[in-house]
Amino acid sequence: MSLRFHEIAEARHRILNPFMHEQLMLLGEICSLTSTTCQLDLCCGKGEMLCVWSQRYGIQGVGVDISPVFLKAAHARAAELNCSDRVTFVEGNASTYAIEPGAFDIVSCIGATWIGGGLAGTLNKLKPGLRSRDSLLLVGEPYWIDEPSDDTVRATSGGNRAAFASLDGTRERIESAGLELIEMVLADHHGWDRYIASQWHTVSDWLRANPDSADADKLREWIVAGKREHLAHQRRHLGWGVFVARLI
């Protein structure tokens, strides 16, 4: 998986997950955000969550991402929404980022649990940053809608069936990490399509504009494989959601 390919394919995205703006704002309501809320968002992408929540609720936040392309967009978005004085973006590898213990009301990692080697490891990485038992941990994670075939497992999780769990299995993994699942906001087919299918158009336009690029052939292969994965497997068998938890 090439970060550059994602930077190209998601150039027109603000939210780098199968989540719609309305769902993002619903999640903010669920979290009871206020101007005193301080959030750490690992793998923040273009910073849309921090920026729109800061604009609406006045939260303060720190976003960490490895992509300078995404962070440039995050800084621009913060300036657009007049919240640059409340949100900070740090370029770095979220998997090795040193989280300040007990410093945050919300700690989040939305759709990037690879930073902890999977869901369990990511939850354990995030927990020390929580300020209190009332603080919230947000994690975005896929789940199996039904029992996947071997072909689906190969196409969507690199052949590792245990990479994801069922929806209830996801609850069990969260609880096994010493957390209580208290809410969730799930993606739907429309959200999946807007996230995935819109990348096809963006990449097609990029390939037309850059036919002689050294990346063209591999990017074309990557996006074609992604189409097959989404249409044959992911859209039907793989769900995605943001799960809201707190310490037991």
Feature locations, PLM:
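A short acidic, Gly/Pro-enriched loop at the edge of an enzyme's catalytic core
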Residues: T96-V107
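Conserved alpha-helix/loop element of class I SAM-dependent methyltransferases that forms part
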Residues: N17-S35
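Short, glycine-/aromatic-enriched active-site segment of Class I SAM-dependent methyltransferases
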Residues: P142-R161
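Short alpha-helix
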Residues: A163-G178
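A short SAM/SAH-binding and catalytic strip from SAM-dependent methyltransferases
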Residues: D105-L119
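Conserved Class I S-adenosyl-L-methionine
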Residues: V185-I248
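Class I SAM-dependent methyltransferase SAM/SAH-binding core
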Residues: L40, E48-T96
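A short glycine-rich, Lys/Arg-flanked "PGG" loop and its adjoining helix->strand segment in the class I
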Residues: A120-L136
